[in-house]
Structures are given as C-alpha cells and as structure tokens.
Amino acid sequence: MQRPFLLAYLVLSLLFNSALGFPTALVPRGSSSSNITSSGPSSTPFSSATESFSTGTTVTPSSSKYPGSKTETSVSSTTETTIVPTTTTTSVITPSTTTITTTVCSTGTNSAGETTSGCSPKTITTTVPCSTSPSETASESTTTSPTTPVTTVVSTTVVTTEYASTSTKQGGEITTTFVTKNIPTTYLTTIAPTSSVTTVTNFTPTTITTTVCSTGTNSAGETTSGCSPKTVTTTVPCSTGTGEYTTEATAPVTTAVTTTVVTTESSTGTNSAGKTTTSYTTKSVPTTYVFDFGKGILDQSCGGVFSNNGSSQVQLRDVVLMNGTVVYDSNGAWDSSPLEEWLQRQKKVSIERIFENIGPSAVYPSILPGVVIASPSQTHPDYFYQWIRDSALTINSIVSHSADPAIETLLQYLNVSFHLQRTNNTLGAGIGYTNDTVALGDPKWNVDNTAFTEPWGRPQNDGPALRSIAILKIIDYIKQSGTDLGAKYPFQSTADIFDDIVRWDLRFIIDHWNSSGFDLWEEVNGMHFFTLLVQLSAVDRSLSYFNASERSSPFVEELRQTRRDISKFLVDPANGFINGKYNYIVETPMIADTLRSGLDISTLLAANTVHDAPSASHLPFDIDDPAVLNTLHHLMLHMRSIYPINDSSKNATGIALGRYPEDVYDGYGVGEGNPWVLATCAASTTLYQLIYRHISEQHDLVVPMNNDCSNAFWSELVFSNLTTLGNDEGYLILEFNTPAFNQTIQKIFQLADSFLVKLKATWEQTGN
C-alpha cells in the first residue's frame, strides 16, 4: 500500500524556510533585474574538505578558494542598466563610518587623601560622508572634461586623554595626573578630479599596523619607555547615487579618500623599583582608503583557465520557459508582498494544525501524549497511525522553526520513542528483551503505542536515523533552555536521553545501514539515496555528543567507520546513485534502468534535511552540489508536462512537483499520480537554503560552465548564454556582494518563490 508520506499540514512547516530573514540590502527580492559588469579579482587556491571521508560527487570549490589565474567576465542583459567604468560623474551619497578606539583616564582622591587614577577604553564612531558638496548634482548626462576636486570638510571632536601634572606625596613618591580633553578634528574627504568616476559597490576594509612608543619619568627621575603594536581596521562603504546615466565604457579607475585618525595610545614600562608604569601619547595616523572599482566576476576552470583572455558576457534570464509554461518572468511585476503576507498567515495555521495532530489533542482525544499522527483521516484513506519517519520530521520542524516548541510535547515524544524501542513487533523483540536492534526498523505503529501487526513494507531503515536527528536537536534545546526534566519520565538528564534512546538508534544504523529496506514511499525494497544520506547525517551529528572519555571507545570507533563506509558507498559510481547516463541523483539504482528513471523528489528532501545548517557542509550532496541542483531542474522539466495543473493557460507562474515521474498513486489508490505539497515545497526549500548559505557564510557563487561540470540548473534556469562562453571545463565565480552576485541571487529568489506562488494560487482557487 502506498501513502502520501506526510499530512498536508505537516508539509506546510517547510514553508518556514521561506521566511529566513535574508538581508534586504543584499537580496532586493522585489526589484527588477539590471546589468552586471565587473572584472579582475585575484584568484586563490582550492580548499580541501574538512573530513577525509567525505568525497563529493563533483569538485566544488569553497567560498573563497579557487584554482587558476584570472580572466574577465561580466553579467549583463540587453534590457538592463550596465554598471561599468564610464565617463559619467556620479554623486557618492552613502556616508562612511570610522571608529576610533582611545583610552580615557580620570583621577580621584581615596580615603587616605591620595590621588589615584583610572583608565578605561572608549570607542568613538564618527561619520565621514563620501558626498559631493551641496552645490553639485548628479545629472543624467555625460561630462566632456575632467571636473574639479570636491573636498568635503567634516568637523568633529575626539575625546582623548592628556598628561596634566605631577605631584609629590609626603613620602616623596611622585604621582601623575591625566585629564580628559576634547580635541577638535577635521576629516577631509576628497573625490579626486577624474574623467571617469565609477560606481563604488564594495565594502573596502583598510588595516593600518603601527608601533606606538611613549616615555615617562618615574619617582627616581629615570626616563622609562615602552612600545606596543597597534592595528587599526576601518571599513568605509560608499555607493553612487540613483540618477546615473552611462554612455561608453572606459578603463576602471581607483579613487583614494584620505583622512587622518587622531587617537591616544598607551604603553607600559618597568622602572628601577620594579613597578610597572603606563604612559599615554596622542597620535595622528594619516590613512588612505582605496576603492578599486574593477572587481566582480572571475572565470576559472576544472582543469585549466579559459584560453580566451578577453572579456565575455554572461546574461541573466529575464523569462524562464519550460514547454510553454512560464516559471518566472523578471520583466513582469514581481511583487512579493502578497506572498509574504500569505506565508505569515499560513505559518500560524500550520503550527496550530501540527499541534492538533500531536497527543494529547482536544480534537483527537484517542491520541496518547507524544504520539504524532500521520493524518486525521481514518477512512479513504486510513492514515490514523504514527510513523517513525513522519513523527521525527514533524518534531524536527517544531524544534527548528517554532518560536515556542512546547517542551512538554517534546518530552512526551521522547517518552513515546523510549517505549516503542522496547515494544515487540513483527520484525522482532524490543531492545528490552534482546540486544538485536532489527525491530527498530518497523515503520508504523498504532496511536495507542501498540505494534501494528498487519502486512506492510518492512523494514524501513530511515526511521531510526531521522529520530536520532530530531532527538539530538531536542537535547540541544533542553541544554540551552536549562529545562529541568524531573522524575516524570524514564530519563532524568540529557545523558539519559542519549544513552537510552539515541544510542540504540545509532546501533541500528551500524548494524543495518547496508541492508535492503523499503524507501520512504514504502514501495520499493532496496538501497535508497534518502535512507543512506539521513543515516550518514545521524551518525555524523552524534559524534560531537560523546564526552572525552568515550571518544576512543569501540562504539565511537564503529560510528566513525560507519560514517566512512556510508559516505564512500554513496559517492562510488559503481553503486549507481551517481550515474554517467544521467545528470541527476538516482534514488534507487536497482530499478533505474527498468521500472523507473530514478528521478525522485526524495533526493531533494534528503539534501534539505541533512544540510539544514552550515556545520553539515562537509557531508556529500550539499544543497549547492550540481547533482542536487540538476535534480531539481530535471524534476521541473519532466513534471511540467505530466500534470494538467502546470498548464500555462491555467496559471502563468510556477511548476507544481510530484514524487517521481512514473508515480500512479493518487492519494488513495492506483490511478493517476499528482503533484504533492510536500514535493513542491521541497523545491523552494532547496533554493532558499542555497541563498541563505551563501549570504550567511558570505560565500561566492560558483557556477560550473559546461555539462562535464554539470550546469543544467544554471544554464537553463538562471543564465541564458552560459554554454556559449567556451568549451573548457570552467567555473563562473560571482564574488560575494558584487552586483553580479546580488542580481543572480535575486533570480534564484524569484525561482524559489515561483513554487510557493503556484501553491498559493492553487489553494486560493480551490478555497483552501
């Protein structure tokens, strides 16, 4: 029997990923596309994987380390405004902020009448506007001759500490007094005369390293001195105004902005009496901030640099079509506000419905506390049961995305897990009766925590792994919240939870990862990508929970070996998950050449679940892996024509996805397959996680340049002419926070939103 895997309300929890709070300055979701032009960043070498066992399916460089030498590339569109070095004079209107750290000292008299002094650091933030004088304006016309220098004088006051006086106490000891002093300071920001002023787009940090020395006289009349190094790092972001107009390109230029930082330095020395003395001096540090306006995009290759050393253009797609269906149209009005409002409403409803399906429930009183039902439906179809997989994914979503995960519900779920592990079922005896873990592979249970004994697809080996992942997150939450577990349940500490529940599920993975089982759709018995990847993730996550004394234990060594074995098995072409015949991940290789194509949304679900945080990036098949992204492309391509709901005449935006192209399950029986909320949301989640990863980690976008490097996703869904740039096995690298990067991220955002727009429109049409 087939089943839909998760109730629709549970699936909607995946929508949480669409509201991750990306920086709007980096990703202007609602703005139209514009041209991107830049050139000439320096290249740096590849970085290796952080784990020796994790060999990927493709060679993907890390965010900032790439091989080869540089060439020039630009991103543009015939309908967009080119940002290039130009003869236009523009106004720099964004202020820059300079932070000065100084030391402030003051004096006071103690109870013995002695004068004492104390010092503390002080940080002064000064705004230095990179702007033209009020008389200048930015016009939409070009200049024919160099302009005069524009110098802006900014006056401010620096609070510093100065030497005041010395005095001699009764015992002959000399004390020094310091006073706080206000020093008027002038910063000059100069935009040098030039016939070509180019857009300032990057935050440019400047670091000044200097050595500061000072002298002082101790009570014996000796002169002491001390020196210390000091590093001053200042970031001055600038941007051009909005009324720009370009005519013709010229060579990139570099603009220097000169200013002076006035600060107070301190140093220490030891006098003849062995005492440590401190002296302060005021120091003016001339500083020049240099803005190089030529950075942007770099081409490099898998095996060698492009032979063409001239510049080339990569054009972003304005419209994406698949068999006549508009996936997204950048030229049309793309207003994300209605979608955002709908997502916020739906998130609230989704959380409410999820908790209604977890016992104790006022809506379904027969559900025991901690039991998660797959669906409230009890006839046509009857899914009023609990599945290990569904329960774990539900709890995982609650802990990961709910502001209030309801700790008592989590503890009740742990209690259910504890007892199900120790309950006999059709696969064998519970772990309370034997050390054999085979019974943990039973996927389906009654809502009263008794075994379901009717025929079913057994075993399903992903359940214990998914349960481990969810419970490890619960352990983290308990530790962070400081929750007292009390004596109500059979575990009184997080150590008990790990030893009495998680350890047994890990033992199951060690014993049975290389054994056949049914897939997550409960249809095919074999070895499956989804099962293996979540098993790998569970083992990998668990290793950080062992204390120092356990890390050399035989059990932990078994876990490490299992991690190596699963990783190697997944990426070995001989096992078929990566197959030269296909440009996507194969879910179940044993049927790929006979019953199915192997294309399956479960591969995206696996990547989304395993790579939900940057800490898992060392595991294979990350969300930026070309194999994962190309799988999404092929799912869209195949399912566009399968389902009538994707007919362009019914809805002009987006593609609804199903489980796999050959699916004939309609939610109750065998007939005609259909799209699923779970599958469509999974596609959005993959892309949102891709965006979030690059922004939060400040990673460059790395795009393979041809089919040998697997670029179907990029060439068919993002760029319009990627395959025409050359035949070498190359990469297109879009540096973080450049115009090329930001506008490409916007395209991916539109593609991700298109799936939810499709979902929203369909539900509104049907009244859901």
UniProtKB/Swiss-Prot annotation:
Region of interest: Y subunit: 693-768
Sequence ranges of Polar residues compositional bias: 49-66
Record keyword DNA repair present: no
Gene3D superfamilies, alphabetized: 1.50.10.10
EC assignment: 3.2.1.3
Residues annotated to bind substrate: W456
Cited InterPro entries: 6-hairpin_glycosidase_sf, 6hp_glycosidase-like_sf, GH15-like, Glucoamylase, Glucoamylase_active_site
Superkingdom field: Eukaryota
EC category name: hydrolase
Keywords of this entry: Carbohydrate metabolism, Glycoprotein, Glycosidase, Hydrolase, Polysaccharide degradation, Signal
Location of the active site: D519 (proton acceptor), E522 (proton donor)
Sugar-modified residues: N35, N309, N323, N415, N424, N435, N514, N547, N646, N651, N721, N742
Signal peptide start-end: 1-21
Keyword Glycoprotein in record: yes
Region listing for Disordered, in residue ranges: 29-83, 125-149
Renumbered residue ranges of the record's region H subunit: 349-692
Catalytic activity: Hydrolysis of terminal (1->4)-linked alpha-D-glucose residues successively from non-reducing ends of the chains with release of beta-D-glucose
Similarity comment text for this entry: Belongs to the glycosyl hydrolase 15 family.
Entry protein name: Glucoamylase S2
Gene: STA2
